[in-house]
Amino acid sequence: MLGLLRRLFDNNEREIARYYKQVVEPVNRLEAEVEKLPDLAAAYRELKEKHEKGASLDELLPMAFALTRESAKRYLGMRHFDVQLIGGAVLHEGKIAEMKTGEGKTLVATLAVALNALTGKGVHVVTVNDYLARRDAEWMGPVYRGLGLSVGVIQHASTPAERRKAYLADVTYVTNSELGFDYLRDNMAISPDQLVLRHDHPLHYAIIDEVDSILIDEARTPLIISGPAEKATDLYYKMAEIAKKLERGLPAEPGVRKEPTGDYTVEEKNRSVHLTLQGIAKAEKLLGIEGLFSPENMELAHMLIQAIRAKELYHRDRDYIVQDGQVIIVDEFTGRLMPGRRYGEGLHQAIEAKEGVRIERENQTLATITYQNFFRLYEKRAGMTGTAKTEEKEFQEIYGMDVVVVPTNRPVIRKDFPDVVYRTEKGKFYAVVEEIAEKYERGQPVLVGTISIEKSERLSQMLKEPRLYLPRLEMRLELFKKASQKQQGPEWERLRKLLERPAQLKDEDLAPFEGLIPPKGNLRTAWEGLKRAVHTLAVLRQGIPHQVLNAKHHAREAEIVAQAGRSKTVTIATNMAGRGTDIKLGGNPEYLAAALLEKEGFDRYEWKVELFIKKMVAGKEEEARALAQELGIREELLERIREIREECKQDEERVRALGGLFIIGTERHESRRIDNQLRGRAGRQGDPGGSRFYVSFDDDLMRLFASDRVIAMLDRMGFDDSEPIEHPMVTRSIERAQKRVEDRNFAIRKQLLQFDDVLSRQREVIYAQRRLILLGKDEEVKEAAIGMVEETVASLAENFLNPEVHPEDWDLEGLKATLLDTAPQLQDFPFAELRALKAEEAVERLVEAALKAYEAREAELSPPLMRAVERFVILNVVDNAWKEHLHNLDVLRQGIFLRGYGQKDPFQEYKIEATRLFNEMVAFIKSEVAKFLFRLKVEAEPVRPVREAPYVPVPEAKPEPSEVFGVERKRATPPPQPGLSRAERRRLMRQEKKRKK
């Protein structure tokens, strides 16, 4: 194991050495030359011309990086460190740069962005929320504009026109969800002017910030665009009432109980519930039905299961909050609200019923994609985060991305203390309060990380209300009494009398009795515990001011995080991933100065205002004063910013002397990465700091995944909450539990990807063909329409014209009725004459007649109008069929695992069934399009002709598992070949005829 770790780190060190030689040294050599350039944009244009003439990006990297570094120096007052140049090169190579908090990932991205923007194909910088997208675009904008590059930013409220403009910019800052939804919406567009992504190279190069959060934590969350489904919602209220009446039982367990008890059992690990036979009978009685799981009642059974899941597995202020009468999901990884996101399969409606709020109509999926498959569509992708190395295997296996750990600019000196483990959650929280009180009294800033809104508010309440701590004092007192019961004498009697009123105890009351207590042993331990409890209560009574940062209090997020490093500051926050603001010791003078100027009416994000603030904070007052005059900033504001700077500087020295920011984790997360993200908030850029996690065996991680043997051992040994549990077995149990969950979640994500890959291949085929119809030339649209008519007519005819059956026995009346249902224009066709032909010839004759009827229909409407009708019809039919197909796949997937009981591989079965469903959908699309094109009535003001879009090459999708619209993109025409589809053969024949004419 050690050898493997050594090899991993050796590989990383070799990579870093390579970057120093190939990137850092050449860029540094160019620095003096670039500093003298009067026009950086002109120099950047020269690089662009070189690239257009054939120079590779790798060849242009040193000069592009040097220009970007100089632009940052001139317009932001920031210079890329050497290690940041390495980070930029890692991103350019399509890898993941692991960079610790405070190492300047935002600035690093500008290097790879500027280099890859030379292609003119657009670069997307992907962030986790709107605030970071806007902040980074405005903050780094001057660097790009200094090089002559345009910058776009997309927000949730951006209009289609604003989105289109932003995506056409050289650099686009956008959140992962907005980007994914724009892709899905583009593939639902019915005219080219509805598209917002670029027509050519819509997904060229993406740099994903917090890449582990997006590609791993959110990998299981599909992006879904949905429309209302036809389903009664009042039933959910009834199911919520029935769920309340059902009682939770215990599952069957070998050697304990043969049968499950109660009405249902719960599997928290898998977030699933199972009705017992008793529960099924009770539910049937309450519903007034028989056979809850019979086909006609399956919908009711599904709704009841979701109601029980909502009751047992989804908790208010942990998984969701209720705000303004709406159930809003809380992101389990970032602690942020996700308005607009809804749980699927009726679960959201079940939660709404449980909470008694208005139930929104259930939705049907119109388009969907997972982040896993969406980001794999990019020609090149890269990522950056503070924590990725632990997940390198997953990044390599699923995304083909290596992780490079970029060295810090200064060594990390943060002290990470061992975990403190308690038997119960109550004991753990008392210990956390004691630690906070101790650090607060010293003046050391504390950041407390919790995993849910509920826990953050509970801890806040304990700090606000000293009475909630009294049980801890009483427990400590009982332990001391027990340890000292054999002690005799007048002094002991005085002490016992004093201890009769514990709530009134003060530190000074206990001080005179210090000499009574021996220096070592149980009595000393109990005495120290009592003293600590008395002192903590005294500090709580004086008050511990603190800030709570969770999804309910997100409005002041940046301000709270920016000032979390000030002395005597206590901040309680839910998961810290993607908070985007550095915690600076002594407070953030730049943020305070920006807030001051904003209050005075200045735009804090305007680059000259930002530059002024940076110069002032850095003490470069002469340069700052020149900018102040230009911006109209008054002298008294300069004086106030100077005071802010000095206050923060003095406080920083005070905090450094106290040991820096101290991190308290109140629970181990399922993933070590999330724990490391919290730890990483302290010790930025070589600052001092410390961290410690408090764990209890009531925590979800330990309760669900820790070894039963360890818990049984603790029960036998009679551990209580007076002292933490220190045992190597416990420490190993925590590590194993996290590893077990990480492995399980990786397996789930791999399985999700395996199943989603089947859908992904089908989606690529449909979307590529759909894009061909939307953006292709008129002749290509006509070719597709004719191909569908041919396939449909031929397929219908072959059902009746069996070559194995004598022509006299063919059901021509049935054939006629079927064909006229699709193409009424064939009314006058001489069907009786078909008996004189062979089956194949008869089919060809019918196809030719249908094509003549189609040509006549085109002449009747005019070619431009016919093309517009074809586009409209094909796109609408495809969208409706695809919507239904997604629903069918969803139903298939829900039940496919039952086939495992029949000794069949569920995935292989899913693949076979999904392919069959896809082929059926394709046949349906062709049939419906043909029917619509023949039968559609066009009124006086019909469909407005769509102006033919400029020809855009669409990457050819492999027609798997079936050729979709009967045609492929036009190529040089070879003579007809055997083995081609009928549509392809006829297309080639038509092109051959045209060529001869």
UniProtKB/Swiss-Prot annotation:
It is an enzyme of class 7 (translocase). It comes from the Bacteria. It catalyses: ATP + H2O + cellular proteinSide 1 = ADP + phosphate + cellular proteinSide 2. Residues 950-997 are annotated as: Disordered. GO terms for biological process: intracellular protein transmembrane transport; protein import; protein targeting; protein transport by the Sec complex. Residues 957-971 have a biased composition (Basic and acidic residues). It is found in: Cell inner membrane; Cytoplasm. One of its GO terms (cellular component) is cytosol. ATP binds at Q84, G102, E103, G104, K105, T106, D582. It holds the Pfam family SecA_PP_bind. Gene3D superfamilies: Helical scaffold and wing domains of SecA (1.10.3060.10), P-loop containing nucleotide triphosphate hydrolases (3.40.50.300), SecA, preprotein cross-linking domain (3.90.1440.10). One of its GO terms (molecular function) is protein-exporting ATPase activity. Part of the essential Sec protein translocation apparatus which comprises SecA, SecYEG and auxiliary proteins SecDF. Other proteins may also be involved. Monomer and homodimer. NCBIfam families: secA (TIGR00963). This is Protein translocase subunit SecA. It comes from Thermus thermophilus (strain ATCC 27634 / DSM 579 / HB8). The lineage of its organism: Bacteria, Thermotogati, Deinococcota, Deinococci, Thermales. The gene is secA.
